[in-house]
């Protein structure tokens, strides 16, 4: 939920800073207002047009690890839509493998991405734990 903003907040101001999702895949059912943007290959931003008839599929860091970078985690952000005076609702479904699932890059993806593993051998549970520590959501103990 992104609460309505006052008239003094500029259109295009960032509401959720650029990031990639930690999980495997995110499914996003059409948001109630515009604002989602994805980064293109040149570092520019592309507005994502979604509605109640669309499901937006966003690959995350875990999928990037498993595919040795063939499928990149999508860098995205949320900016103020032209009408930021109304609430914006978004219903993401973050999918995670079980903690014991091995996210070691698969041989077929290593072969397709230059022949060398670019990402670590790690379980989904340890991957999530490390990332949550990195962003300060849990302590390293």
Name these PLM-found stretches:
Residues 1-141:
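C-terminal flanking tails of non-heme Fe-dependent oxygenases
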């Amino acid at each position: 939920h992104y609460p309505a903003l006052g008239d003094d907040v500029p259109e295009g101001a960032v509401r959720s800073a650029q990031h990639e999702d930690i999980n495997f895949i995110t499914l996003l059912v059409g948001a109630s207002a515009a604002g989602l943007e994805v980064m293109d290959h040149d570092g520019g931003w592309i507005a994502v047009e979604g509605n109640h008839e669309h499901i937006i599929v966003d690959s995350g860091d875990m999928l990037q690890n498993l595919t040795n970078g063939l499928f990149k985690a999508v860098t995205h952000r949320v900016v103020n839509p032209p009408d930021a005076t109304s609430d914006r609702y978004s219903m993401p479904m973050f999918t995670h493998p079980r903690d014991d699932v091995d996210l070691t890059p698969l041989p077929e993806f290593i072969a397709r991405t230059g022949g060398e593993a670019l990402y670590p051998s790690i379980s989904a549970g340890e991957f999530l734990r490390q990332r949550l520590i990195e962003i300060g959501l849990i302590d390293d103990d």
